[in-house]
Amino acid sequence: MDSQRNLLVIALLFVSFMIWQAWEQDKNPQPQTQQTTQTTTTAAGSAADQGVPASGQGKMITVKTDVLDLTINTRGGDVEQALLPAYPKELGSNEPFQLLETTPQFIYQAQSGLTGRDGPDNPANGPRPLYNVEKEAFVLADGQNELQVPMTYTDAAGNTFTKTFVFKRGDYAVNVNYSVQNAGEKPLEVSTFGQLKQSVNLPPHRDTGSSNFALHTFRGAAYSTPDEKYEKYKFDTIADNENLNVSSKGGWVAMLQQYFATAWIPRNDGTNNFYTANLGNGIVAIGYKAQPVLVQPGQTGAMTSTLWVGPEIQDKMAAVAPHLDLTVDYGWLWFISQPLFKLLKWIHSFVGNWGFSIIIITFIVRGIMYPLTKAQYTSMAKMRMLQPKIQAMRERLGDDKQRQSQEMMALYKAEKVNPLGGCFPLIIQMPIFLALYYMLMGSIELRHAPFALWIHDLSAQDPYYILPILMGVTMFFIQKMSPTTVTDPMQQKIMTFMPVIFTVFFLWFPSGLVLYYIVSNLVTIIQQQLIYRSLEKRGLHSREKKKS
């Protein structure tokens, strides 16, 4: 029995350590804050390019759909601001969440265009193109399902380049179509590129982190190829000039933060070069450059790419590009978190409340694990029955640890007791607990998701710490109801304070996770009583007062 309790303590400490370690691995170390200056520099060739120099400001046009509110600069056609009207900046706020931003304090842009030998975005061909637009404000009207925003540029040779943003109702994926009309007598060689650039340091208005470890998630770059489905690239790695330079057919590049992402997905059959670059001034970039395309004289060439700018909605992202849904970063336990989330989402489709969905999924998980739980308690009961024999054996053999171990194993074999039989439910519960943590911290559906009463956001900590206290109370009751053979005063004190210690740990955990643990403890109490009644009938348990 002592070993079972020690294993429980070790298991809980292990869970806490793994969460802390995951945070340490994923969080980006923040260097000393430095002032970020505005720039329109782009590394639109490869990781080694020095970038397109700044060339003056264009006009700012606005595009509004039912889910996006973008600002596009006619100089280059870059998306310099993106607001998400469906997602408030903070709980209870009327201000929309801002994903892309261009201010003196912070840069986060989605850049794109045509480079290559004859591309207007090639630095060797002069300033970036200044596109013409028919109006400065575009709005997706009621009843309209698609909105096109065409931008045109004609170079000195009379070649016309058209860049058209295509928006669809309810969609965070924006197609960017290019048309190149060759008015000259020689072929034009152009390549599409897409680049995401961002300031490494977060200003106060962008920093949604916290001083506690339970609320930090990965912020950085990522890419995908047919060979590497999902690879993260930290901002500080790019800032240290440890740059990516990969050629691939298909795939995507992205920048990630908790719940939201931007990504460029090239749409071509050729090879793309994926790169990262340190652009200076505290700004880093990840992007792609497509294989060159030749447009013959008198002909028109067409190319396209897709920009994702919005929340990390798994099913929608998966429909846009293979493995794009993996940007919902569930950590190393993704293979558990993903099925859990699918089950949770299915339950939510019936009950309509994420908190009640968590309660139901807890009952389902614990119900599936009931045979193992019963085996655990049976093993623990048999171990208690053997304690007098084990104690007598220890007294008889004294300090001969080797003989103690040999005779103890022989005793277990004779009595058909597995000393580790009570560990399996604990081993199974640990990854489930961690997977649920990742799921709560990574699923946009649970952001600002209310439960009941004072719990208005299941992804955030309980503002009044009521749930952690209730968790500690349930843990205390489980401890008091469980038989023990602990006689060492120090171990007794440690076990007595375990509910208090873990209540403190859980103060900063997401309330949805604490809710899961409370319900799991309540299920444990119920199952405990049912199992004890069964064990009483077999003579393996008695209702005598628990030792303290």
Swiss-Prot record:
Which Gene Ontology MF annotations are present?
membrane insertase activity
Look up the record and report any one GO term of the cellular component aspect: plasma membrane
Matching entries from InterPro entries are given as:
Membr_insert_YidC (IPR019998), Membr_insert_YidC_N (IPR028053), YidC/ALB3/OXA1/COX18 (IPR001708), YidC/Oxa/ALB_C (IPR028055), YidC_ALB_C (IPR047196), YidC_periplasmic_sf (IPR038221)
Segments spanning the bilayer are: 6-26, 350-370, 424-444, 458-478, 499-519
**Record has Transferase as a keyword:** no
Membrane topology label? Multi-pass membrane protein
| GO BP terms, alphabetized | protein insertion into membrane; protein transport
Q: Which NCBIfam families match?
A: PRK01318.1-1 (NF002351), PRK01318.1-3 (NF002352), yidC_nterm (TIGR03593), yidC_oxa1_cterm (TIGR03592)
What's this chain's function? Required for the insertion and/or proper folding and/or complex formation of integral membrane proteins into the membrane. Involved in integration of membrane proteins that insert both dependently and independently of the Sec translocase complex, as well as at least some lipoproteins. Aids folding of multispanning membrane proteins.
The name this protein goes by in its record? Membrane protein insertase YidC
Per the UniProt entry, what species is this protein from, by scientific name?
A: Salmonella heidelberg (strain SL476)
Taxonomy-wise, where does this protein's organism fall, top ranks first? Bacteria, Pseudomonadati, Pseudomonadota, Gammaproteobacteria, Enterobacterales
